[in-house]
Amino acid sequence: MEFNEEFYVALGFVIFVAILLYYGVHNKLNAALDKRADRIREDLAHAVRLREEAAALLASFEKRKAEAEAEAEALVAQARTEAEMIAKEAHERLAEFVQRRTQQAENKIANAEAQAMAEVKAIAADAATKAAEILLTDAAKGAYGQKLIDQGIDGLKAAAH
């Protein structure tokens, strides 16, 4: 019987497999593969948990974001309302200030007019007095003037008694 190299390779392979089976390498391989499969399952379960936690965090952050946006909108609305109230109050104060200034100016103008009228009346009275003095001085010269003086003295005596 002649054996060729293929026979020896096949015989070596069968012996090799028999040795592996004798030492239980297949059990160790199965155990290693099972261990690897369990670790992969754990990793997948952990990944699923992480994904769920991430989804929960995302939902929480989106809720917080919505709350923050609503709060920001409320703050903006409140600030806008306060700004409008401040502007309205400033406008009212300005209107009151303008009204007071206008009233003060009108009062000053009225006082100036009254003072000017008083000065004009005083000047007119002085002018009338001077004119009357000049007229009376011219008219009171001589006997007529003496007669007026006597009448004035008699009037004073009568008023005194």
Swiss-Prot record:
CC per GO annotation: plasma membrane; proton-transporting ATP synthase complex
GO molecular function: proton-transporting ATP synthase activity, rotational mechanism; proton-transporting ATPase activity, rotational mechanism
Membrane topology per record: Single-pass membrane protein
Keywords: ATP synthesis, Cell inner membrane, Cell membrane, CF(0), Hydrogen ion transport, Ion transport, Membrane, Transmembrane, Transmembrane helix, Transport
Residue intervals passing through the bilayer: 6-26
Keyword RNA-binding: no
Record Pfam families: ATP-synt_B
Keyword Cell membrane attributed: yes
The organism's place on the tree of life at top rank: Bacteria
Compartments it resides in: Cell inner membrane
InterPro entries reported for this sequence: ATP_synth_b/b'su_bac/chlpt, ATP_synthase_B_chain
Complexes and interactors: F-type ATPases have 2 components, F(1) - the catalytic core - and F(0) - the membrane proton channel. F(1) has five subunits: alpha(3), beta(3), gamma(1), delta(1), epsilon(1). F(0) has three main subunits: a(1), b(2) and c(10-14). The alpha and beta chains form an alternating ring which encloses part of the gamma chain. F(1) is attached to F(0) by a central stalk formed by the gamma and epsilon chains, while a peripheral stalk is formed by the delta and b chains.
HAMAP family: ATP_synth_b_bprime (MF_01398)
Reported function: F(1)F(0) ATP synthase produces ATP from ADP in the presence of a proton or sodium gradient. F-type ATPases consist of two structural domains, F(1) containing the extramembraneous catalytic core and F(0) containing the membrane proton channel, linked together by a central stalk and a peripheral stalk. During catalysis, ATP synthesis in the catalytic domain of F(1) is coupled via a rotary mechanism of the central stalk subunits to proton translocation.
Family: Belongs to the ATPase B chain family.
Protein name: ATP synthase subunit b 1
Origin species: Beijerinckia indica subsp. indica (strain ATCC 9039 / DSM 1715 / NCIMB 8712)
Gene for this chain: atpF1
